[in-house]
Regions:
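Short glycine/threonine-rich loop-to-helix capping motif typified by GTGT followed
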Residues: 145-154, 182-198, 215-229, 266-275
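Glycine-rich phosphate-binding loop plus the immediately following alpha-helix
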Residues: 1-19, 53-55, 60-88, 258-270
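Accessory alpha-helical/coil subdomains and C-terminal extensions
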Residues: 35-41, 57, 62-166, 185-190
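Gly/Ser/Thr-rich active-site loops/lids in small-molecule metabolic enzymes
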Residues: 1-10, 64-79, 218-256
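Glycine-rich, mobile lid/loop segments that gate access to catalytic sites or pores
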Residues: 1-55, 60-63, 298, 305-309, ...
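Alpha/propeptide regions of enzymes that mature by internal proteolysis
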Residues: 1-13, 112-113, 125-137, 216, ...
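Internal helix-turn-beta structural module
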Residues: 234-336
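Flexible, glycine/charged-enriched surface loops at secondary-structure junctions
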Residues: 12-20, 80-99, 129-143, 161-185, ...
């Protein structure tokens, strides 16, 4: 109940795990302490941005770096303090959890064997083998899906504009908005120079990024963050293309994909979805109102009904989770 309430308000995975650690005997280093003095080897699959060992799986073999006061602050931020069960208040009202010293965990060896970065690096190799000029943008993408959709729309526009003669004023405008948004999102390691360099090659382009977005629930539809992100990117591209300045996009084939590496996006059977810049126009001609589906957080229903689910990413459960992968493919029309 606690994590569902937090997730519905847009809490990050870091915030969710901070609360989980405070409410568990095994999380936050509890498992390692229970095993002491036996040697402990922990093989870790990271599903958290930045791979912080004390946050992944709520850190059962890592000393906790958070206090009870931080838990109260998180619950207050999302206006959930009064909605918590009495049992939660009882636990959190206890004495602050003292941070264990490093020597308490000298018997523990933690090794990250899988992460979003590793998945992206392998995807990059695969794309290059398929003939794409690939750029790994970031493995720390996070934020509300509508903002991230705007980010990807601007990245796509800048990539295409950089490969198109003229349009210098529009390119400067797009690059300026993109730079401001990147700074606002505080995405470390996302360098626009890599995109500009990619635009100068003759190969089709593959932009790769990963992380974990959040969805602000406003409706009662069915969907997941990856499907909603794909649908919002499609809408952003549709709007950009509909303007007089956006006609340059018609010269390119563009595909965006967002998928969860665990094979399940929200309470759906899909891992995510893909879209093109033509998707919204095609949907409108078939009688679908994309904005209505988005306003109801009903992206899965849209993708199931639209073209018989052709745009859904169906992998089945993978048995692992290293967050989400975002892939953009750009190819100039008429170029093999």
């Amino acid at each position: 109940m606690v994590t569902k309430l937090l997730a519905s308000r847009g809490a990050t995975i870091q915030e969710l795990n901070t609360i989980r650690k405070a409410l568990s005997l095994l999380k936050g280093g509890g498992l390692a302490q229970s095993a002491y003095p036996a040697q402990v080897l922990s093989l870790i699959l990271s599903d958290v941005i930045g791979d912080p060992l004390d946050i992944i799986a709520s850190g059962p073999t890592v000393a906790s770096s958070h206090s009870i006061q931080e838990c109260f602050q998180i619950l207050t931020t999302y206006n959930l303090l009064s909605d918590m069960p009495e049992s939660v208040h009882t636990v959190l009202s206890g004495s602050p959890v003292e941070q264990a010293t490093q020597k308490d965990f000298s018997h523990v060896h933690n090794v990250v064997i899988g992460s979003n970065r590793l998945a992206l690096e392998e995807a990059k190799r695969q794309a290059e083998d398929m003939g794409y000029f690939s750029v790994l943008l970031s493995d720390t993408v996070c934020g509300e899906v509508s903002t991230i959709a705007r980010l990807y729309c601007l990245l796509i526009q800048l990539t295409c504009l950089s490969a198109t003669a003229g349009n210098d004023l529009l390119k400067d405008k797009v690059e300026g908005e993109l730079s401001s948004l990147v700074a606002k999102l505080a995405l470390p390691g996302l360098h626009l120079r890599d995109i500009l360099r990619a635009s100068q090659v003759e190969k089709p382009i593959c932009l790769l990024a990963g992380g974990e977005t959040t969805v602000q629930l406003r409706g009662n539809g069915k969907g997941g963050r990856n499907q909603e992100l794909a649908l919002r990117v499609a809408l952003e591209l549709h709007r950009a293309r509909a303007t007089a300045d956006g006609r340059f996009l018609e010269k390119y084939e563009i595909v965006f994909l967002s998928g969860g590496t665990d094979g399940q996006d929200g309470p759906t059977e899909a891992a995510g979805a893909c879209c093109s810049q033509e998707l919204v126009g095609e949907a409108e001609r078939e009688g679908f109102n994309v904005e209505e589906f988005l306003n109801n957080n009903d992206s899965y229903t849209f993708f199931v009904r639209f073209q018989s689910g052709h745009h859904l990413l169906m992998t089945g459960l993978t048995g692992t989770n290293v967050m989400d992968l975002h892939i953009v493919l750009i190819r100039a029309k008429g170029r093999d």
